[in-house]
C-alpha cells in the first residue's frame, strides 16, 4: 500500500521532516516515490514552517494513497491557513 508520511532529517534535537510518498513497508527514512513537501517544527521568525504540494498530494490520494495521521493533520491545517 502506498502511504504519504514524514521522514526525519536534521540533527539531534533539531528535527526537519520531508513529506514523502512511499510504500508502507519501507523503513521510515528509506527510499520514497516522490517528495511532496516539508515540515519544520522548529522554525522561528520568518522561516517557512510548512510547504505542501497539494496538487500532487491530491493526485496520490486519488490513486489510493493513505495519509498518515500527522500528515493528515498538516494537510488540514494548511488548507485552513490558505
Swiss-Prot record:
Gene3D superfamilies: 3.30.1320.10
Ribosomal protein listed as a keyword: yes
GO molecular function: structural constituent of ribosome
InterPro entries attached to this UniProt entry: Ribosomal_bS16 (IPR000307), Ribosomal_bS16_dom_sf (IPR023803)
Tagged with keyword Cell membrane: no
Cellular component, GO annotation: cytoplasm; small ribosomal subunit
Entry keyword set: Ribonucleoprotein, Ribosomal protein
Chain coiled-coil ranges: none
GO biological process: translation
Protein family: Belongs to the bacterial ribosomal protein bS16 family.
The protein's name: Small ribosomal subunit protein bS16
Gene: rpsP
